[in-house]
Amino acid sequence: MEPRDGSPEARSSDSESASASSSGSERDAGPEPDKAPRRLNKRRFPGLRLFGHRKAITKSGLQHLAPPPPTPGAPCSESERQIRSTVDWSESATYGEHIWFETNVSGDFCYVGEQYCVARMLKSVSRRKCAACKIVVHTPCIEQLEKINFRCKPSFRESGSRNVREPTFVRHHWVHRRRQDGKCRHCGKGFQQKFTFHSKEIVAISCSWCKQAYHSKVSCFMLQQIEEPCSLGVHAAVVIPPTWILRARRPQNTLKASKKKKRASFKRKSSKKGPEEGRWRPFIIRPTPSPLMKPLLVFVNPKSGGNQGAKIIQSFLWYLNPRQVFDLSQGGPKEALEMYRKVHNLRILACGGDGTVGWILSTLDQLRLKPPPPVAILPLGTGNDLARTLNWGGGYTDEPVSKILSHVEEGNVVQLDRWDLHAEPNPEAGPEDRDEGATDRLPLDVFNNYFSLGFDAHVTLEFHESREANPEKFNSRFRNKMFYAGTAFSDFLMGSSKDLAKHIRVVCDGMDLTPKIQDLKPQCVVFLNIPRYCAGTMPWGHPGEHHDFEPQRHDDGYLEVIGFTMTSLAALQVGGHGERLTQCREVVLTTSKAIPVQVDGEPCKLAASRIRIALRNQATMVQKAKRRSAAPLHSDQQPVPEQLRIQVSRVSMHDYEALHYDKEQLKEASVPLGTVVVPGDSDLELCRAHIERLQQEPDGAGAKSPTCQKLSPKWCFLDATTASRFYRIDRAQEHLNYVTEIAQDEIYILDPELLGASARPDLPTPTSPLPTSPCSPTPRSLQGDAAPPQGEELIEAAKRNDFCKLQELHRAGGDLMHRDEQSRTLLHHAVSTGSKDVVRYLLDHAPPEILDAVEENGETCLHQAAALGQRTICHYIVEAGASLMKTDQQGDTPRQRAEKAQDTELAAYLENRQHYQMIQREDQETAV
């Protein structure tokens, strides 16, 4: 029987339950080999109450889950260990160790609970969040986790005295949550939370492995579930179970062992094993092969894409085993690939640029893995031509990591040609042709994308040299682009590559192309392996009408040789192509003087040389597949209709950033554009053409759109169905997605340049009474014959700080989103004059888009207020919901503008709120 609430047992449990959680997975990773697990006893799981509600599990009910045997040499308490932010691969690694990173989430209470929290009465105490199990604690409270017996999900098991091949399974890792998305797996109801950021109430119990969640009450969470095997969730096929990873015991150096070592030393000398294969490692991999599994190794380059890499690592640690996620800045991919080389059906995900992919492919070549694991790509940063070729897109936007893992699992395995480059000095070059700044060696001896020489390499080389000399001047993507443009223009005026044809000789498959090149007089010659080049352009084009050339492939063993004049280089950016020279299997290129060259984007000035290009091998890659091909049609599934009639609705960037985790609110904030009719099997590429024609039809549906603002060229589709939130679809991947997979009756698009009030379907009709309150501005379409106030009058009222006049104009139907010639809004002008009353009025009555509206130089009103040191106005704007992560044309955020104005207090405030915004979004993205 359960004790009553007044009993001593219940009271003692009550005091502990606020901080209690269970980790039922501890026992599968190394329990004491000679002790049988104790049977669950109801006396050890009393019915408990926490703030008036029954809780399902408590610390007191988990004492039967003994911790694993201590590791020799390992620290015995949390306080004696350092706070780790990376996975520990040493022999002293702690079982169930958390992976901490700093966080500013003020809404989450310390996980250890009030009884054990040592910092609850302190102010400004730093907090840490575990990337693998998502608990948040004060930094001083980390050592208290041992007192409540809470460890992170285990990432390995002890070998012990058992047979290492003995089959084992993973148990759930249960964690109490005060905030939880989704629905209870038992009752199907949502997790009701009235005050998300201030509630101490534990509402859910969820597993860090499979992400299943239950209400924290005995009617939903059954006690027997604590020891149930865990399925590892929807990504079980790619998750490497902790039961595969064993911590090995260091061999004992006994006298008998040393004699055996000496006796076998001669045999080891003649062994074919390399030094890496023979040395002892603290961890070994003992996989259990299964045809249904595709275990995944994730390699992340944190330097790629600004700060994207570091954030991506945290997301993968949550979805996967932390010991299958590797930071390439911590030593490269070789150790991990060597350790996992015997895992069957292994796949690799490279998170970074094309250079990161090349690094991993070269390492696979060195290790000679048979068969080589296929490599998928999560593109970070810009460029990413190889990722575009394999349908992974030109960069990472905000696609959920869960969807990325599904794409990697379902992707098609394809081949990629890789080419050897062998350069040697040209013996025929004279001393007058030598250049002191030139080198005899290429930056890379293998390329996957392209090898080029001439104009493009010269521009890239100047950029790299300038960045190495003055790195502080190249910390902005906008500045980098401006430098590229300026260098290209000056190089064009100087004509530094106009005589390229006079100094090179090209022989392809024994045929001399030099006369053809001299007639063409190109300023750039490219040897291309993949269709994409220079951030997505297609220089080979589609030679369907030319019988002399075949369409380009990345697995046919042929290179495409292309020449570029200045005219064809300019046409390349608008869909043109270069001058097709030939397709060949081998190239011999001879240069008679120092010429700039680049190998997959790595430039150098190469001295007069003789360069031979030949096929090296083929790498195995993962190509992102069309989604319908990965989902077979079920018998109860509805057939695709011949035609689809779909409502198109547009979403502004401000609404998307604020609401894309709340589908219903974002749908309400969308602006209807009209209706399109497309074939039932249309992909998004075809649908885009129909949508762009929508507003071009004067008498069509687009003319009746509630908004007259046309679509900007940068609009993209939003997936509203396949995830728990909206997310953007890269334009380069539109051909991979069907309309029926991202929309039902309505399709949503994101327009980053949409300004003005969001049109709603519930706008008042022309017969509705006109609003008289300043809180209800009159839409222009509802004013009949009365002419609306001129925008210039509104601007003047804001400039003169004339609050009454502005209010009067607004009541008369003035558009608070009016802009002047410099694209400055009324809020920009109000901030410039420092008028707090006008600022408050605009924030209360103008559409939310005004908060992040930018003027010509890319400044928002918050940038302006921060630069002027207007602390109160900054507070108003931030509290209204303005983005603190927007950058101006100089690449500065509002916080950086405050720092430049030497207002340290304002900068500290903005930094605090910026972190809060980032953590808020991250918490929502990783919520179960």
UniProtKB/Swiss-Prot annotation:
Domain notes: The PDZ-binding motif mediates interaction with PDZ domain-containing proteins like SNTG1 and SNX27.
Chain spans, region Disordered: 1-46, 59-82, 251-280, 759-788
Record gene name: DGKZ
Class of enzymatic activity (EC top level): transferase
Intervals of motif PDZ-binding: 924-928
Pfam families: Ank_2, C1_1, DAGK_acc, DAGK_cat, DGKI
DAGKc domain boundaries: 291-425
Tissues and organs where the protein is expressed, per its UniProt entry: Highest levels in brain, and substantial levels in skeletal muscle, heart, and pancreas.
Xref: Gene3D superfamilies: 2.60.200.40, 3.30.60.20, Ankyrin repeat-containing domain, Probable inorganic polyphosphate/atp-NAD kinase, domain 1
Subunit structure: Interacts (via PDZ-binding motif) with the PDZ domain of the syntrophin SNTG1 and that of SNX27. Interacts with IRS1 in the absence of insulin; insulin stimulation decreases this interaction. Found in a ternary complex with IRS1 and PIP5K1A in the absence of insulin. Interacts with PIP5K1A.
Protein name stated in the entry: Diacylglycerol kinase zeta
Enzyme Commission number(s): 2.7.1.107, 2.7.1.93
Catalysis: reaction(s): a 1,2-diacyl-sn-glycerol + ATP = a 1,2-diacyl-sn-glycero-3-phosphate + ADP + H(+); a 1-O-alkyl-sn-glycerol + ATP = a 1-O-alkyl-sn-glycero-3-phosphate + ADP + H(+); 1-O-alkyl-2-acyl-sn-glycerol + ATP = 1-O-alkyl-2-acyl-sn-glycero-3-phosphate + ADP + H(+); 1,2-didecanoyl-sn-glycerol + ATP = 1,2-didecanoyl-sn-glycero-3-phosphate + ADP + H(+)
Zinc finger (Phorbol-ester/DAG-type) residue numbers: 98-152, 172-230
